Structures are given as C-alpha cells and as structure tokens.
C-alpha cells in the first residue's frame, strides 16, 4: 500500500503531487526508463499535448503489463525542453488526467534539449505494488 505523507510543517506542494510517498513493503517495483513521445509507428507528434498523451498512454501500457495501475505510481520525473516551458500547464494537465486524481511524488525539470530535437518531454516513473 502506498500513501502520501502530509509533510507536517512544510509548505504545501505547488501543484497536484505529494511531497513524499511511503510504500509499505511492496513485493514488486516497476522502474521505467524515460518514456519519450514516439508512437508505435515511429512518429513523434508535433504538439506538446499530443506528446504528453503518447508518453502517458505508454506509461499506462507498461503499468498494465506489470499488473499495476496509476494508483501504484510513487514517483514521477518529468523533463520538458526549456523553450517550451510556457506549456508546463499542458504537461501537468495530462499527468493529472492520466493519474485520475492519484498524487505521487513528482519532480519537473526544464532542460536545454532532449536527445532528439523533436522530443519536447520525457517522463520516468517508479511504481510499487503489494
């Protein structure tokens, strides 16, 4: 079972995420690589919204393959190309939509660029299930 710590005495999170998650003796852990916005046919959508959908739908497929759900995600690391930092609300909205109200520990970092110039974002998650 995973649950958020309230962070007594700390500032509230800046968005819909948890400051820390405790996993009570998980029997299985899933660590993804950075998931990038490449569709199964090898294309990369142009818009940030479409890239976020590709990334998060890929993460959901991996969770399903591991017999897990979004509620099992304990940590999210998101990288967004700095030139597109004005689209962070789009990235965060996609995350929230795919998590369905679940809050995980989350770090969002802007970077000068990713490996391929058409990639605008990349997400890695850790999930724990009992």
Residue locations for each model-derived region?
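N-terminal presequence-like segments and the immediate start of the first folded domain
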Residues: 1-74, 80-130
């Amino acid at each position: 079972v995973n649950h958020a710590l309230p962070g007594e005495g700390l500032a509230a999170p800046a968005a819909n995420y948890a400051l820390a998650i405790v996993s009570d003796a998980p029997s299985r852990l899933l660590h993804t690589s950075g998931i990038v916005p490449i569709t199964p046919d090898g294309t990369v959508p142009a818009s940030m919204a479409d890239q976020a959908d590709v990334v998060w739908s890929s993460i959901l497929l991996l969770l399903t393959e591991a017999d897990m759900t979004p509620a099992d995600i304990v940590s999210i690391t998101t990288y967004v190309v700095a030139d597109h930092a004005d689209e962070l609300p789009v990235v965060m909205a996609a995350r929230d939509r795919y998590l369905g109200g679940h809050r995980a520990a989350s770090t969002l970092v802007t970077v000068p660029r990713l490996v391929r110039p058409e990639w605008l974002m990349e997400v890695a998650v850790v999930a724990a299930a009992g």
